[in-house]
Design a protein with these regions (language model features):
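Helix-to-beta-strand junctions that scaffold the AdoMet/dcAdoMet cofactor pocket
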Residues: 40, 120-121, 134-135
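A short glycine-rich, Lys/Arg-flanked "PGG" loop and its adjoining helix->strand segment in the class I
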Residues: 124-136
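Class I SAM-dependent methyltransferase SAM/SAH-binding core
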Residues: 46-48, 52-100
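A conserved beta-strand element that flanks and buttresses the S-adenosyl-L-methionine
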Residues: 112
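Conserved class I S-adenosyl-L-methionine
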Residues: 1-40, 141-166
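Short alpha-helix
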Residues: 170-184
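Short catalytic micro-motifs in class I SAM-dependent methyltransferases
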Residues: 115-116
Length: 184
C-alpha cells in the first residue's frame, strides 16, 4: 500500500540529512546563496515543507523572522533540535500544512518552496494558497527537481519507488511544465 506523504517523510527524517549531504549538499548551498540575494533583513518568510531545516536555518540570519512548516512531525522535531543547538531565535518550526488557518492572507514577504513542488499532487491549489499568503509584491522562491529531464540513478529510483507504491505522488516535470504551473 502506498504510504501517505506524512508517513513517507516521517520515515525519511532519520536519514534525510545524511542523504542530503551525499546527494544534494552542493544544490542546497547554491539554492541558499541564490535565495539570500532576494531576501531582506526586514522580511518575514515562510519555508513551506522545510524538512529538517537545512534551508530554513541557513537563511535565518538574513531575515527578521522565518517560519518553517512541514507535514512530518519527525522532520520538524529534527529541525527544532538543530535550531535549539545553534541558538537560533528568529525561527518558528511547526508541524502543519500550507492550509493552516494561522497562515493569514498577506502575511509573508517571501515563501520558499525547496524541493517540494514535485511532490505536490494538488499543485494548483497549493500555488493559489502561496499567492494568498504572500504580501503584495511578495516573492515566491522555489528550487525544484525536474525529474522529467534526463534519467539519473536518483530519478530512476524515485520513479521506481512511485510506480511500485513505495513513495507517495511524485511529478516528472520538465522546467517548462513546472514554469507553466507556477505562472498560471
Amino acid at each position: 500500500m502506498r504510504p501517505t506523504a506524512k508517513e513517507f517523510w516521517d520515515r525519511r527524517a532519520a536519514v534525510y540529512d545524511a542523504d542530503a549531504g551525499v546527494f544534494y549538499r552542493e544544490a542546497y548551498e547554491k539554492t541558499t546563496a541564490c535565495m539570500r540575494k532576494y531576501l531582506k533583513p526586514t522580511d518575514t518568510v515562510l519555508d513551506f515543507a522545510c524538512g529538517t531545516g537545512i534551508v530554513t536555518l541557513s537563511l535565518s540570519p538574513d531575515v527578521k523572522a522565518l517560519r518553517g512548516i512541514d507535514i512530518s512531525d519527525e522532520m520538524i522535531r529534527r529541525a527544532q533540535g538543530k535550531a535549539a543547538a545553534q541558538g537560533i531565535a528568529n525561527v518558528l518550526l511547526t508541524q502543519t500544512d500550507l492550509f493552516d488557518a494561522s497562515l493569514a492572507p498577506a502575511s509573508f514577504d517571501a515563501v520558499l518552496a525547496c524541493n517540494v513542488l514535485l511532490y505536490v499532487e494538488r499543485r494548483a491549489e497549493v500555488l493559489a494558497r502561496i499567492s494568498e499568503i504572500l504580501r503584495p509584491r511578495g516573492m515566491f522562491l522555489s528550487a525544484t527537481d525536474c525529474l522529467g529531464v534526463g534519467m539519473t540513478r536518483e530519478r530512476m529510483r524515485k520513479w521506481f519507488e512511485y510506480r511500485t507504491g513505495k513513495r507517495p505522488f511524485v511529478a516528472f516535470d520538465t522546467r517548462e511544465t513546472l514554469a507553466q504551473d507556477i505562472l498560471r
